[in-house]
């Protein structure tokens, strides 16, 4: 029987002393409260420069899992792209130049698609604005922006400012206009809800939508009148001088999101020759370019390809002949696998994976427990089996229910997780294992913005907990730790040497 070391990542579980609409603090959590009092604990950083993001930028699930799994600060795509813009090399990028050259050669159209948002989680609107300026400088005559609206990593009704900025820039440059708008709920699905993606695709490619208006602002106003906030804006086309924009052969499409997980599905709809998730009129002959690599299987150009880190936690465990398990429900499965392994799709030798389907509900406040019962059943069985040296799991609830802005549902989610943690604690202690509990970023710790008194659906920049549960004596060895210090801590408790590529430090010292 192996003594399992378990890492539990509570997605969106930040720490705050404030009890103002703090679903984590105000929920009834007897297990969490007793663990917090009884076992060694500290708070660590999960945002900003400490995870390779710009200063004051909130963390997110992708960034969090990359930093945890790699055991070092990994500079994120947002930071890399910002640097390229600052150093004025963005416009020299080979993939971007090729997309623009294709348009000029064929006298065709350039389409920019992506999340028009200052959120900085999946995209940043400043990248879109810079791309528009570069297109003008390089001689593009017709540029059309297909704007996905946020309302999740930003306040629910905050898109007006971004739309006005984009409209003004396009008008000032006499370059084109916003040709369609669409809530990210449709264009950025990641759970195989292809009916949503189909609506977004048809609006962008075929100018086929339920609603057509004369401007993006009018589309937004009418959406609010239907009580649809930014995230849920039904795909809408914009008609200018009687003209609707379609994507045609020989056009170039540049996808301006830098985060992969919610950009994959619609990218496959654009690029796969044998695509069969919904009917398309035809397979387009276009130049399709993505800002970063969304999926190695996509047939497209990539402006900023990934740099593969070596000696991640998964790789070190493999080299030491350890068995490992990754488990999560659909919403967070890529995070404990692809992102945790530093952007590697393939499993390591000795690495098993369990995917639990997320419930098919419109929004997760309708089912706050999500698939946590099934995840916990599988986890307890895996611990009891004695098969695994290391298990990494993710509970999605505090993040996904937190994003709905429903405070009562978020508290229900937290209370359910507390029961799950109780089962894990009992199993780990019974088998003399080690359990670490942490989070990748905050969310449910602030469900209402205290300044605006409106629902807060974005992540927070609060510190996150890091707790050791086990029979070993542990002392906090590192003040002001961060997510990249977690992997070295796991290696420490497992008695495995830390590779030089891991620059993180152990958070706890354990008595031998």
Swiss-Prot record:
**Which reaction is recorded as catalysed by this protein?**
(2R)-2-phosphoglycerate = (2R)-3-phosphoglycerate
- Per UniProt, where does Mn(2+) 2 bind? 11, 61, 440-441
Q: Name one GO molecular function term.
A: manganese ion binding
Positions bound to Mn(2+) 1: 399, 403, 459
Q: Which residues are substrate-binding?
A: 122, 152-153, 184, 190, 259-262, 332
The record's comment on cofactor binding reads: Binds 2 manganese ions per subunit.
Q: Where is the active site?
A: 61
Q: Which family does it belong to?
A: Belongs to the BPG-independent phosphoglycerate mutase family.
Q: What is this protein called?
A: 2,3-bisphosphoglycerate-independent phosphoglycerate mutase
Organism (species): Francisella tularensis subsp. holarctica (strain LVS)
Phylogenetic classification of the source organism:
Bacteria, Pseudomonadati, Pseudomonadota, Gammaproteobacteria, Thiotrichales
Tell me what gene encodes this. gpmI
């Amino acid at each position: 029987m192996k003594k399992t070391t378990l890492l539990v990542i509570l997605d969106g579980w930040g720490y705050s002393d404030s009890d103002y609409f703090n679903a984590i603090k105000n929920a009834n959590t007897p297990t969490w409260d007793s663990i917090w009092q009884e076992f060694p604990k500290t708070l660590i950083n999960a945002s900003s420069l400490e995870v390779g993001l710009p200063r004051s930028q909130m963390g997110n699930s992708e960034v969090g899992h990359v930093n945890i799994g790699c055991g070092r600060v990994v500079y994120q795509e947002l930071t890399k792209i910002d640097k390229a813009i600052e150093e004025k090399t963005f416009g020299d990028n080979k993939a971007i130049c090729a997309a623009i050259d294709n348009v000029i050669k064929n006298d065709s159209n350039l389409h920019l698609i992506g999340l028009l948002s200052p959120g900085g989680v999946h995209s940043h609107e400043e990248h879109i604005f810079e791309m528009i300026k570069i297109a003008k400088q390089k001689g593009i005559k017709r540029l059309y922006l297909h704007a996905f609206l946020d309302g999740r990593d930003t306040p629910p009704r905050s898109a007006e400012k971004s739309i006005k900025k984009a409209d003004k820039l396009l008008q000032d440059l006499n370059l084109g206009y916003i040709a369609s708008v669409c809530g990210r709920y449709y264009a950025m699905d990641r759970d195989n809800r292809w009916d949503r993606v189909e609506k977004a695709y048809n609006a962008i490619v075929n100018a086929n939508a339920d609603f057509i208006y004369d401007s993006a602002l009018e589309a937004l106003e009418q959406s609010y009148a239907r009580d649809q906030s930014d995230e849920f804006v039904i795909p809408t086309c914009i008609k200018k001088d009687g003209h609707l924009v379609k994507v045609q052969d020989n056009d170039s499409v540049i996808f301006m999101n830098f985060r992969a997980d919610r950009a994959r599905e619609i990218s496959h709809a654009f690029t796969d020759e044998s695509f069969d998730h919904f009917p398309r009129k035809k397979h387009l002959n276009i130049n399709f370019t993505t800002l970063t690599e969304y999926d190695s299987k996509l047939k497209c150009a990539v402006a900023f390809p990934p740099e593969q880190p070596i000696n991640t936690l998964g790789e070190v465990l493999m080299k030491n002949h350890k068995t490992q398990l990754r488990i999560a429900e659909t919403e967070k499965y890529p995070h404990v696998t692809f992102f945790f392994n530093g952007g590697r799709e393939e499993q390591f030798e000795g690495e098993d994976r369990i995917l639990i389907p997320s419930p098919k509900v419109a929004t997760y406040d309708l089912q706050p427990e999500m698939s946590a019962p099934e995840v916990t059943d599988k986890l307890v069985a895996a611990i009891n089996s004695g098969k695994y040296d290391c298990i990494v799991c993710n509970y999605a609830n505090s993040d996904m229910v937190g994003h709905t802005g429903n405070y009562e549902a978020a508290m229900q989610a937290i209370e359910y997780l507390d029961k799950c943690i109780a089962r894990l604690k009992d199993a780990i202690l019974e088998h003399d294992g080690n359990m670490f509990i942490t989070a990748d970023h905050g969310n449910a710790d602030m469900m209402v913005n205290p300044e605006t008194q409106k629902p807060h659906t974005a992540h927070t920049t609060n510190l996150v907990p890091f707790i050791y549960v086990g029979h070993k004596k542990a002392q906090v060895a590192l003040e002001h730790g961060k997510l990249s210090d977690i992997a070295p801590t796991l290696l420490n408790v497992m008695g495995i040497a830390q590779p030089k590529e891991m620059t993180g430090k152990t958070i706890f010292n354990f008595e031998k």
